[in-house]
């Protein structure tokens, strides 16, 4: 059950950024959120995977054990969650609910499946969905293969999933090309600022 305030705040915007594995969501998101003129609060996701270089507990993710994550699932603590390549990812309801109750605009960096769930949940409420796309699938494969050392079957799973996810891009409000993280971040900041301005002016 979703808490009423989670979906009922009509003067707060929900911005979701998603895209295939390896497209650079985390890097672009960090650049966007460093801009103090972006009046958004990053909704920190929870995961069972190990931290990557430069990732900080409680800032990039809440890193937990599989046992703890599954306890949260049993308690219906997630807005959305998914399991991918052996690791869980999810958006804690309580955290998002707290931000919305405080009147904050929320920025979600979530998996594509989670974004689909969020679009349904927030239908009719202020929300912007952004899909980050790579310059080419060949470039995406290069990034995935060189980002970390993984077994070939895991890489194949990531690439297959990326194919399926890219086919869903037309479900999003905006598609942003990540040919340069700075340019992509600037485009997303412009989208957010324009949407916030419209919300302030019209309430919609």
List the predicted regions and their residue ranges.
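ATP-binding Walker
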Residues: 23
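ATP-dependent NMP and nucleoside kinases share a basic, alpha-helical "lid"
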Residues: 70-77, 91-148, 192
